[in-house]
Curated annotation (Swiss-Prot):
<dbReference type="GO" id="GO:0004526">
    <property type="term" value="F:ribonuclease P activity"/>
</dbReference>
<dbReference type="GO" id="GO:0030677">
    <property type="term" value="C:ribonuclease P complex"/>
</dbReference>
<feature type="region of interest" description="Disordered">
    <location>
        <begin position="73"/>
        <end position="93"/>
    </location>
</feature>
<keyword id="KW-0378">Hydrolase</keyword>
<dbReference type="InterPro" id="IPR002730">
    <property type="entry name" value="Rpp29/RNP1"/>
</dbReference>
<dbReference type="InterPro" id="IPR036980">
    <property type="entry name" value="RNase_P/MRP_Rpp29_sf"/>
</dbReference>
<keyword id="KW-0540">Nuclease</keyword>
<keyword id="KW-0255">Endonuclease</keyword>
<comment type="function">
    <text>Part of ribonuclease P, a protein complex that generates mature tRNA molecules by cleaving their 5'-ends.</text>
</comment>
<comment type="subunit">
    <text>Consists of a catalytic RNA component and at least 4-5 protein subunits.</text>
</comment>
<dbReference type="GO" id="GO:0001682">
    <property type="term" value="P:tRNA 5'-leader removal"/>
</dbReference>
<dbReference type="InterPro" id="IPR023538">
    <property type="entry name" value="RNP1"/>
</dbReference>
<dbReference type="InterPro" id="IPR023534">
    <property type="entry name" value="Rof/RNase_P-like"/>
</dbReference>
<keyword id="KW-0819">tRNA processing</keyword>
<dbReference type="Pfam" id="PF01868">
    <property type="entry name" value="RNase_P-MRP_p29"/>
</dbReference>
<dbReference type="GO" id="GO:0005737">
    <property type="term" value="C:cytoplasm"/>
</dbReference>
<protein>
    <recommendedName>
        <fullName>Ribonuclease P protein component 1</fullName>
        <ecNumber>3.1.26.5</ecNumber>
    </recommendedName>
</protein>
Amino acid sequence: MTTITPESLPRHELLGLHARVAADTDQSRVGIAGRVVDETMQTVVLRTASGVAQVPKKGATFEFRLTDEAAAPDNGVGTAFKPAGGETRQTTGESVAYVTVDGGRLLSRPERRSENGVDSKWR
């Protein structure tokens, strides 16, 4: 399995990752948090405690929670080991890193975004 770093996160599959809207041009969306259950070219769909929320990528900043080997201490710039805003969150004992990504970096079809970031001897 490839380790996800702050630099490589925009090229990876986001489905299944826990995400939180850290900032948004629409203040009503700030703080929405949940698991990524779908992604389109321009939106991220999060399953939250109260249902499903579709958040436009443009104008949003997302904070992704990465666990275990993806949270290695050498992840570098852009990785925090505490969430932005200082609130605490419980985990099940695994290593956790929080990676903040501008939604503009995610604007594209998910399959194209991941294809373009991967070196392949077949292309």
